Amino acid sequence: MKLTILILLVITSFCSCGILREKYAHKAIDVLTPMIGVPVVSKIVNNAAKQLVHKIAKNQQLCMFNKDVAGWCEKSCQQSAHQKGYCHGTKCKCGIPLNYK
C-alpha cells in the first residue's frame, strides 16, 4: 500500500512538471489503486488522487492559494502584456487584481 501511494505521488509530480499529461496520469491511477487491499480505501484513494492530479495539472505559473510562489505569473505577464500579474487561485491573470481578500 505504501509503495502504491508513493508511485501515485511520483505520477502527480510528473504531471505538475508537464512531463506526463493528465489523462495518462488518470489511467495510471486506475491501474495502481486496485493494488490497495481494502476496496473502500482503494476507491477513496483513486478519487482523491484524480482530483489532486487535476488541480495540479491546471495550475498556471505556480500560482497557489492566490500567491505567486515562484514569481512566474508576474514575469510572464510582464513579458506578454506589460502588466502586473495576479494569481486567482491557481490561475494567473494579467492586469486583473483580486476583487476579494
From Swiss-Prot:
Chief location of this protein within or outside the cell = secreted
Keyword Ubl conjugation on this protein?
no
Name the Gene Ontology molecular function terms of this record.
potassium channel regulator activity; toxin activity
All residue ranges annotated as the BetaSPN-type CS-alpha/beta domain in the record:
60-100
Q: Which domain of life is it from?
A: Eukaryota
Location within or outside the cell? Secreted
Q: Which UniProt keywords apply?
A: Disulfide bond, Ion channel impairing toxin, Potassium channel impairing toxin, Secreted, Signal, Toxin, Voltage-gated potassium channel impairing toxin
Tissue specificity, in the record's words, reads: Expressed by the venom gland.
Pfam families recorded for this chain?
Answer: Scorpion_toxin_alpha-beta
Q: Which cysteines are joined by disulfide bonds?
A: 63-87, 73-92, 77-94
Identify the stretch annotated as signal peptide in this record: 1-17
What's a single GO CC term here? extracellular region
**Family note:** Belongs to the long chain scorpion toxin family. Class 3 subfamily.
This molecule's function is given as: Inhibits voltage-gated potassium channels.
Q: State the protein's name.
A: Hg-scorpine-like-2
Q: Give the originating organism.
A: Hoffmannihadrurus gertschi
